[in-house]
């Protein structure tokens, strides 16, 4: 957050700062590794991290570029300090029961195809470019001839998955919608808090 009282310019200046951490995330490990002497505060989601930053309860927090691209959707006055020293990987997690093995194979194939045909880049431009999208994919009319997939989504992890007006939206959500269209599934999105995702699976 940019303010008159203190403006951090480098990673090193955060070494003894008050830092927010997304509970159970890779940022927890990275914060401990990069800033072992900092004071750390746990938060359930990115929205509460930002609110605490606004209230001066924390000085900052680690966030990947995907999440940061949505910070400016509703608010202004923030800055980021870029670092190429760390990377965070993403994946879709499936349970080991039911038709998960079949779905995993299909999803792996579909994402590989999206990477080669430009589908991922199109969604990235829509969701990760810093501009708030105004048009969304409709998943209410999916055919479902091959079954129904229940998909856990975060309530407020913009721009990847979040719920707005009782509708699931986001980069991850639209990947799943495109997948369901291609393979004949219907989607039941189940909003959960971040820490409840694994339990739901």
Regions found by a protein language model. Name each.
Residues 39-42, 46, 51, 122, ...:
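Extracytoplasmic small-molecule ligand-binding "clamshell" domains
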Residues 1-2, 22-26, 45-46, 62-69, ...:
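Beta->alpha turn/N-cap motifs
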Residues 77-83, 90-94, 139-141:
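A structural signal for short loop-to-beta-strand junctions that line the ligand-binding cleft
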Residues 10-14, 18, 39-42, 53, ...:
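Soluble extramembrane regions of membrane proteins in the secretory/endomembrane system
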Residues 18-21, 61, 93, 149-154, ...:
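Short, well-ordered beta-strand segments
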Residues 30-33, 47-87, 196-199:
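A ligand-binding cleft/hinge motif common to bilobed small-molecule-binding domains
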Residues 10-12, 33-34, 161-166:
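Short acidic, glycine/proline-rich loop/turn micro-motifs
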Residues 2-5, 16-28, 32-33, 67-69, ...:
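Extended ligand-binding regions for polar small-molecule ligands
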């Amino acid at each position: 957050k940019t303010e008159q009282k203190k403006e951090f310019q480098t990673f090193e200046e955060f070494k003894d700062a008050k830092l927010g951490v997304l509970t159970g995330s890779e940022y927890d490990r990275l914060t401990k590794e990069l800033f072992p002497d900092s004071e750390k505060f746990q938060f359930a989601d990115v929205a509460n991290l930002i609110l605490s930053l606004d209230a001066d309860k924390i000085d900052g927090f680690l966030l990947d570029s995907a999440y940061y691209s949505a910070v400016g959707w509703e608010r202004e006055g923030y800055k980021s300090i870029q670092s190429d020293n760390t990377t965070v990987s993403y994946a879709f997690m499936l349970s080991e029961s039911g038709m998960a093995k079949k779905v995993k194979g299909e999803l792996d194939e579909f994402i590989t195809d999206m990477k080669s045909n430009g589908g991922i880049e199109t969604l990235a431009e829509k969701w990760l470019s810093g501009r708030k999208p105004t048009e969304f994919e409709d998943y209410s009319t999916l055919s479902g001839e091959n079954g129904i997939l229940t998909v856990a989504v975060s309530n407020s992890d913009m721009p990847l998955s979040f719920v707005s007006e009782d509708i699931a939206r986001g980069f991850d959500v639209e990947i799943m919608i495109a997948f369901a269209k291609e393979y004949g599934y219907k989607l039941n999105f189940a909003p959960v808090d971040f820490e409840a995702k694994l339990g739901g699976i």
